[in-house]
Amino acid sequence: MRTKFGVMVAALGLFCVVAPAVAHHGFDTEYDANKKFKHSGVVKAVLWTNPHMRVHVDVTDASGKVTTYNMEITSPNSVQRQGWGRNSLLPGEKVVFEGYGGKVDESRGSLLSIAKADAPNKPLFVQGGPEAVQQGFPGAR
């Protein structure tokens, strides 16, 4: 009886740890794969925070309205393995970026790639997967 109880407690404990981890890392809990976009804008801030970095980019539409896109990236460690340093992307720089918009707010998104406007075909960052491997980024799988 003690063994069964111990197994049940261990299973419940494992579930309590795994469920939040899966929910936290689930792309579709916050972002919409049907809201892919590509914009150009000016970097407002680069936040080197764990567990995920953020890049804020000001995008000006045709009417002159400025929207700040709050884009999530992977961890600082992962972007450093792709060759980023703290001076790779600075506030005030013009960029071209692609991402997926948020389910509630498109301007809070998941960053797919970002490049400086004067070198749009040389991204500084590509979010994992085949694109990163194809671009030859260190640490890409």
Q: Which sequence ranges carry the predicted segments?
A:
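OB-fold/S1-family single-stranded nucleic acid-binding modules
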Residues: G102-G128
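Bacterial N-terminal signal peptides that target proteins for export
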Residues: M1-A10
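Short nucleic-acid-contacting surface segments enriched for D/E, G, S/T with interspersed K/R
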Residues: R81-F97
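Short aromatic-glycine-enriched beta-strand elements
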Residues: T49-V59
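Conserved hydrophobic positions within beta-strands
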Residues: H39-V43
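Short boundary/loop segments of OB/S1/cold-shock single-stranded nucleic-acid-binding domains
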Residues: A23-F37
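Short, structured beta-strand/loop micro-motifs enriched in basic residues and often containing a Trp
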Residues: I73-R81
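Bacterial N-terminal signal peptides
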Residues: V9-V18
